[in-house]
Amino acid sequence: MKNVIDVTSKGAMSRRDFIGLASVAAFSAVALSGCSSQESAAPEATSMKIGTMQTEDSLPFWVAEQKGFYGDHDVEVEIITFQSAQELSTAFAAGEIDGAMTDIMVSASLVASGIGLNLAWVTLGATPEQGRFGIQTSPESGIKSLADLKGKGIGVGSNTVPEYVMDKLMEAAGASEGEIVNEEIKKLPVRYESMTNNQVAAAALPGSLLALGEATGMITLADDTQGVGNVSQSVLAVRSSWLEGGKAALESVRLAWNDAVAAIEADPEGFRDLLVEKANLPGIVADTDPISSYPEAELPTKDMVDPVLDWMKGKEYLQADVAYDSETGDLKTK
Protein backbone atom coordinates (compact mmCIF):
# COMPACT_ATOMS: atom_id res chain seq x y z
CA MET A 1 0.00 0.00 0.00
CA LYS A 2 1.30 3.47 -0.81
CA ASN A 3 0.28 6.98 0.19
CA VAL A 4 2.01 10.21 -0.77
CA ILE A 5 3.03 13.14 1.42
CA ASP A 6 4.13 16.29 -0.38
CA VAL A 7 6.18 18.48 1.94
CA THR A 8 8.77 21.10 1.05
CA SER A 9 12.30 20.32 2.25
CA LYS A 10 13.91 22.80 4.65
CA GLY A 11 17.45 21.63 4.04
CA ALA A 12 19.72 18.93 2.73
CA MET A 13 21.35 16.05 4.53
CA SER A 14 23.34 13.48 2.58
CA ARG A 15 23.96 9.80 3.09
CA ARG A 16 23.80 6.87 0.78
CA ASP A 17 19.99 6.83 0.84
CA PHE A 18 20.18 9.80 -1.50
CA ILE A 19 21.66 7.65 -4.21
CA GLY A 20 18.64 5.42 -3.94
CA LEU A 21 16.56 8.31 -5.27
CA ALA A 22 18.54 8.11 -8.51
CA SER A 23 16.71 4.97 -9.56
CA VAL A 24 13.68 7.14 -10.33
CA ALA A 25 15.86 9.48 -12.39
CA ALA A 26 17.60 6.70 -14.30
CA PHE A 27 15.06 6.56 -17.10
CA SER A 28 15.02 10.31 -17.73
CA ALA A 29 18.80 10.30 -17.53
CA VAL A 30 18.97 7.97 -20.49
CA ALA A 31 16.77 10.32 -22.48
CA LEU A 32 19.05 13.22 -21.66
CA SER A 33 22.06 11.20 -22.78
CA GLY A 34 20.60 10.88 -26.25
CA CYS A 35 18.58 7.69 -25.86
CA SER A 36 21.41 5.65 -27.35
CA SER A 37 22.44 2.27 -25.99
CA GLN A 38 25.11 1.80 -28.65
CA GLU A 39 28.43 2.65 -27.02
CA SER A 40 31.69 2.91 -28.96
CA ALA A 41 34.84 1.19 -27.76
CA ALA A 42 37.02 3.31 -25.51
CA PRO A 43 40.78 3.81 -25.93
CA GLU A 44 43.10 2.48 -23.23
CA ALA A 45 42.37 4.56 -20.13
CA THR A 46 44.98 5.85 -17.69
CA SER A 47 42.54 7.86 -15.58
CA MET A 48 39.08 7.48 -14.10
CA LYS A 49 36.29 9.85 -13.09
CA ILE A 50 34.21 8.58 -10.19
CA GLY A 51 30.95 10.22 -9.15
CA THR A 52 29.56 10.08 -5.64
CA MET A 53 27.18 11.77 -3.26
CA GLN A 54 28.25 13.08 0.14
CA THR A 55 28.22 9.70 1.84
CA GLU A 56 30.38 7.61 4.15
CA ASP A 57 30.51 4.84 1.55
CA SER A 58 33.10 6.79 -0.44
CA LEU A 59 35.56 7.41 2.41
CA PRO A 60 38.22 5.04 0.98
CA PHE A 61 38.15 6.96 -2.32
CA TRP A 62 38.83 10.20 -0.45
CA VAL A 63 41.50 8.59 1.74
CA ALA A 64 43.26 7.24 -1.36
CA GLU A 65 43.20 10.76 -2.79
CA GLN A 66 44.52 12.32 0.43
CA LYS A 67 47.28 9.74 0.91
CA GLY A 68 48.43 9.64 -2.71
CA PHE A 69 47.55 5.99 -3.24
CA TYR A 70 46.30 6.59 -6.79
CA GLY A 71 49.69 7.94 -7.80
CA ASP A 72 51.34 4.96 -6.14
CA HIS A 73 49.49 2.75 -8.61
CA ASP A 74 50.01 4.97 -11.67
CA VAL A 75 46.42 6.06 -12.20
CA GLU A 76 44.79 9.48 -12.17
CA VAL A 77 41.44 9.62 -10.38
CA GLU A 78 39.02 12.51 -10.14
CA ILE A 79 36.35 12.20 -7.46
CA ILE A 80 33.33 14.29 -8.43
CA THR A 81 30.73 15.02 -5.76
CA PHE A 82 27.14 15.55 -6.92
CA GLN A 83 24.57 17.51 -4.98
CA SER A 84 21.57 15.58 -6.24
CA ALA A 85 20.84 11.98 -7.12
CA GLN A 86 19.47 12.94 -10.52
CA GLU A 87 22.68 14.79 -11.39
CA LEU A 88 24.74 11.71 -10.53
CA SER A 89 22.50 9.38 -12.53
CA THR A 90 22.39 11.73 -15.51
CA ALA A 91 26.16 12.17 -15.55
CA PHE A 92 26.67 8.40 -15.50
CA ALA A 93 24.15 7.83 -18.29
CA ALA A 94 25.75 10.57 -20.40
CA GLY A 95 29.28 9.20 -19.96
CA GLU A 96 30.48 12.27 -18.08
CA ILE A 97 31.80 9.99 -15.35
CA ASP A 98 33.27 6.51 -15.70
CA GLY A 99 32.05 5.07 -12.42
CA ALA A 100 29.51 5.86 -9.73
CA MET A 101 29.29 5.00 -6.07
CA THR A 102 25.69 3.84 -6.01
CA ASP A 103 23.51 0.86 -5.11
CA ILE A 104 22.05 -2.20 -6.78
CA MET A 105 18.61 -0.63 -7.31
CA VAL A 106 20.01 2.35 -9.20
CA SER A 107 22.34 0.11 -11.20
CA ALA A 108 19.54 -2.24 -12.24
CA SER A 109 17.31 0.68 -13.24
CA LEU A 110 20.08 2.12 -15.41
CA VAL A 111 20.63 -1.26 -17.08
CA ALA A 112 16.90 -1.64 -17.72
CA SER A 113 17.06 1.78 -19.38
CA GLY A 114 19.77 0.66 -21.80
CA ILE A 115 23.02 1.62 -20.04
CA GLY A 116 25.63 -1.14 -19.93
CA LEU A 117 27.46 -1.38 -16.62
CA ASN A 118 29.56 -3.60 -14.39
CA LEU A 119 29.36 -3.89 -10.61
CA ALA A 120 33.09 -3.60 -9.91
CA TRP A 121 33.01 -4.13 -6.16
CA VAL A 122 31.08 -3.66 -2.93
CA THR A 123 32.01 -0.36 -1.30
CA LEU A 124 30.04 -0.93 1.90
CA GLY A 125 27.90 -3.81 3.12
CA ALA A 126 30.11 -6.87 2.73
CA THR A 127 28.92 -7.72 6.25
CA PRO A 128 25.67 -6.73 8.01
CA GLU A 129 27.62 -4.44 10.35
CA GLN A 130 28.88 -2.25 7.49
CA GLY A 131 26.37 0.51 6.90
CA ARG A 132 23.08 0.76 8.75
CA PHE A 133 19.48 1.31 7.73
CA GLY A 134 16.49 1.04 9.98
CA ILE A 135 13.04 2.17 11.08
CA GLN A 136 12.71 4.96 13.62
CA THR A 137 9.80 6.57 15.44
CA SER A 138 9.24 9.42 17.87
CA PRO A 139 8.65 8.83 21.58
CA GLU A 140 5.23 10.51 21.26
CA SER A 141 4.03 8.06 18.60
CA GLY A 142 3.14 5.29 21.03
CA ILE A 143 4.87 2.80 18.72
CA LYS A 144 6.86 0.28 20.76
CA SER A 145 7.72 -2.40 18.19
CA LEU A 146 7.57 -3.19 14.49
CA ALA A 147 4.41 -5.18 15.15
CA ASP A 148 2.75 -1.91 16.17
CA LEU A 149 3.46 -0.54 12.68
CA LYS A 150 1.26 -3.06 10.87
CA GLY A 151 -1.20 -1.03 8.82
CA LYS A 152 0.37 2.30 9.79
CA GLY A 153 2.20 4.68 7.48
CA ILE A 154 5.99 4.51 7.33
CA GLY A 155 7.80 7.36 5.61
CA VAL A 156 10.03 6.01 2.85
CA GLY A 157 11.17 6.60 -0.74
CA SER A 158 10.14 3.97 -3.29
CA ASN A 159 12.76 1.83 -5.03
CA THR A 160 15.48 2.68 -2.52
CA VAL A 161 17.66 0.76 -0.10
CA PRO A 162 15.62 2.01 2.90
CA GLU A 163 12.41 0.66 1.35
CA TYR A 164 14.04 -2.70 0.68
CA VAL A 165 15.39 -2.89 4.25
CA MET A 166 12.03 -1.72 5.63
CA ASP A 167 10.22 -4.53 3.81
CA LYS A 168 12.70 -7.11 5.10
CA LEU A 169 12.44 -5.84 8.68
CA MET A 170 8.64 -5.74 8.60
CA GLU A 171 8.44 -9.21 7.03
CA ALA A 172 10.73 -10.54 9.79
CA ALA A 173 8.30 -9.01 12.31
CA GLY A 174 5.45 -10.98 10.76
CA ALA A 175 3.84 -8.26 8.65
CA SER A 176 2.11 -9.26 5.44
CA GLU A 177 2.54 -7.24 2.26
CA GLY A 178 -0.82 -5.56 2.81
CA GLU A 179 0.13 -4.53 6.33
CA ILE A 180 3.21 -2.58 5.18
CA VAL A 181 1.97 0.93 4.36
CA ASN A 182 4.35 3.25 2.50
CA GLU A 183 4.05 7.00 2.94
CA GLU A 184 6.01 8.25 -0.07
CA ILE A 185 8.46 10.94 1.10
CA LYS A 186 11.47 11.10 -1.21
CA LYS A 187 13.48 13.82 0.50
CA LEU A 188 15.36 12.56 3.52
CA PRO A 189 15.21 15.76 5.60
CA VAL A 190 11.45 15.96 5.04
CA ARG A 191 11.03 12.29 5.89
CA TYR A 192 13.01 12.72 9.09
CA GLU A 193 11.04 15.82 10.11
CA SER A 194 7.74 14.09 9.30
CA MET A 195 8.70 11.35 11.73
CA THR A 196 9.84 13.71 14.50
CA ASN A 197 6.65 15.78 14.07
CA ASN A 198 4.43 12.66 14.15
CA GLN A 199 3.11 13.21 10.62
CA VAL A 200 3.97 9.57 9.97
CA ALA A 201 4.09 6.72 12.45
CA ALA A 202 7.72 5.97 11.63
CA ALA A 203 10.37 6.49 8.96
CA ALA A 204 12.86 4.28 7.12
CA LEU A 205 16.22 6.03 7.39
CA PRO A 206 19.96 5.59 6.76
CA GLY A 207 22.49 5.37 9.56
CA SER A 208 23.38 9.04 9.86
CA LEU A 209 19.77 10.06 10.44
CA LEU A 210 19.20 7.14 12.78
CA ALA A 211 22.18 8.43 14.79
CA LEU A 212 20.83 11.99 14.69
CA GLY A 213 17.46 10.78 15.90
CA GLU A 214 18.96 8.70 18.67
CA ALA A 215 20.97 11.73 19.83
CA THR A 216 17.76 13.76 20.09
CA GLY A 217 15.51 11.19 21.76
CA MET A 218 13.99 9.31 18.82
CA ILE A 219 13.52 5.53 19.07
CA THR A 220 15.08 3.10 16.59
CA LEU A 221 12.72 0.13 16.41
CA ALA A 222 15.02 -2.09 14.33
CA ASP A 223 17.92 -1.91 11.90
CA ASP A 224 19.60 -4.24 9.43
CA THR A 225 22.81 -4.85 11.37
CA GLN A 226 21.24 -7.91 12.97
CA GLY A 227 18.40 -10.32 12.49
CA VAL A 228 17.65 -10.03 8.77
CA GLY A 229 20.94 -11.05 7.16
CA ASN A 230 23.10 -8.90 4.94
CA VAL A 231 20.53 -6.95 2.93
CA SER A 232 22.07 -3.56 2.06
CA GLN A 233 25.08 -2.90 -0.12
CA SER A 234 26.65 0.05 -1.88
CA VAL A 235 28.62 -0.69 -5.03
CA LEU A 236 30.97 0.91 -7.51
CA ALA A 237 29.18 0.76 -10.86
CA VAL A 238 31.39 1.19 -13.93
CA ARG A 239 30.24 1.96 -17.46
CA SER A 240 30.78 -1.00 -19.77
CA SER A 241 31.90 1.28 -22.61
CA TRP A 242 34.66 2.77 -20.43
CA LEU A 243 35.66 -0.63 -19.08
CA GLU A 244 36.51 -1.87 -22.59
CA GLY A 245 39.68 0.21 -22.42
CA GLY A 246 39.80 0.77 -18.69
CA LYS A 247 40.54 -2.62 -17.15
CA ALA A 248 44.11 -1.72 -16.19
CA ALA A 249 43.04 1.64 -14.76
CA LEU A 250 40.25 -0.01 -12.77
CA GLU A 251 42.72 -2.54 -11.37
CA SER A 252 44.94 0.33 -10.23
CA VAL A 253 41.96 2.01 -8.58
CA ARG A 254 41.13 -1.29 -6.92
CA LEU A 255 44.63 -1.51 -5.43
CA ALA A 256 44.41 2.08 -4.21
CA TRP A 257 41.02 1.34 -2.64
CA ASN A 258 42.49 -1.64 -0.80
CA ASP A 259 45.39 0.50 0.45
CA ALA A 260 42.88 3.05 1.76
CA VAL A 261 40.81 0.34 3.45
CA ALA A 262 43.94 -0.86 5.26
CA ALA A 263 44.78 2.71 6.32
CA ILE A 264 41.28 3.25 7.73
CA GLU A 265 41.40 -0.08 9.54
CA ALA A 266 44.73 0.87 11.14
CA ASP A 267 43.59 4.31 12.33
CA PRO A 268 39.87 5.02 11.79
CA GLU A 269 39.79 8.12 13.99
CA GLY A 270 42.65 9.59 11.98
CA PHE A 271 40.20 10.07 9.11
CA ARG A 272 37.23 11.46 11.07
CA ASP A 273 37.86 15.05 10.00
CA LEU A 274 38.00 13.94 6.36
CA LEU A 275 34.75 12.01 6.74
CA VAL A 276 32.97 14.91 8.45
CA GLU A 277 34.11 17.27 5.68
CA LYS A 278 33.34 15.06 2.71
CA ALA A 279 30.19 13.33 3.96
CA ASN A 280 28.74 16.48 5.57
CA LEU A 281 27.87 14.76 8.85
CA PRO A 282 25.52 16.72 11.12
CA GLY A 283 27.43 18.51 13.88
CA ILE A 284 25.57 16.76 16.68
CA VAL A 285 26.94 13.36 15.55
CA ALA A 286 30.19 14.44 13.87
CA ASP A 287 32.31 13.42 16.85
CA THR A 288 30.38 10.30 17.82
CA ASP A 289 29.08 8.61 14.66
CA PRO A 290 31.09 5.36 14.39
CA ILE A 291 33.51 5.14 11.48
CA SER A 292 32.71 2.00 9.54
CA SER A 293 35.11 -0.69 8.55
CA TYR A 294 35.32 -1.10 4.78
CA PRO A 295 35.65 -4.20 2.62
CA GLU A 296 38.51 -4.93 0.27
CA ALA A 297 37.38 -4.65 -3.33
CA GLU A 298 35.47 -7.78 -4.34
CA LEU A 299 32.56 -8.44 -6.68
CA PRO A 300 29.08 -8.51 -5.18
CA THR A 301 27.81 -12.05 -4.72
CA LYS A 302 24.63 -13.41 -6.28
CA ASP A 303 23.17 -13.60 -2.78
CA MET A 304 23.56 -9.83 -2.57
CA VAL A 305 22.20 -8.96 -6.01
CA ASP A 306 19.57 -11.52 -6.99
CA PRO A 307 17.20 -10.93 -4.03
CA VAL A 308 17.22 -7.21 -4.82
CA LEU A 309 16.40 -7.89 -8.48
CA ASP A 310 13.60 -10.25 -7.45
CA TRP A 311 12.22 -7.60 -5.08
CA MET A 312 12.34 -4.94 -7.80
CA LYS A 313 10.53 -7.24 -10.23
CA GLY A 314 7.87 -7.99 -7.63
CA LYS A 315 7.37 -4.25 -7.08
CA GLU A 316 7.31 -3.65 -10.86
CA TYR A 317 10.24 -1.23 -10.58
CA LEU A 318 12.06 -2.82 -13.52
CA GLN A 319 10.86 -2.32 -17.09
CA ALA A 320 13.17 -5.05 -18.40
CA ASP A 321 14.40 -8.39 -17.11
CA VAL A 322 17.85 -7.80 -15.58
CA ALA A 323 20.32 -10.54 -14.61
CA TYR A 324 23.65 -10.51 -12.76
CA ASP A 325 26.78 -12.49 -13.65
CA SER A 326 28.69 -12.97 -10.40
CA GLU A 327 31.76 -14.24 -12.27
CA THR A 328 32.30 -10.99 -14.17
CA GLY A 329 30.21 -8.40 -12.31
CA ASP A 330 28.21 -7.63 -15.45
CA LEU A 331 24.61 -6.54 -14.96
CA LYS A 332 22.65 -7.05 -18.19
CA THR A 333 19.18 -7.34 -19.61
CA LYS A 334 18.19 -10.86 -20.62
Q: Residue spans of the language-model regions?
A:
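N-terminal secretory signal peptides
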Residues: M1-M13, D17, A22-A31
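Structured segments of extracytoplasmic/periplasmic soluble domains
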Residues: A64, H73, A91, G95, ...
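Secondary-structure end/capping motifs
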Residues: E244-Q319
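Short, solvent-exposed loop/beta-turn-alpha elements that line the ligand-binding surface or hinge
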Residues: D72, A126-P128, Q226-G229, P295-D303
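Bacterial signal peptide processing site
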Residues: S36-Q38
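Pocket-lining segment of extracytoplasmic ligand-binding domains
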Residues: M105-V106, N182, K187-L275
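Conserved C-terminal helix/tail region of periplasmic/extracytoplasmic solute-binding proteins
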Residues: D310-K334
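Short, glycine-/small- and polar/acidic-enriched structural segments
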Residues: A42-S176, N182-I185, A201-G207, N230
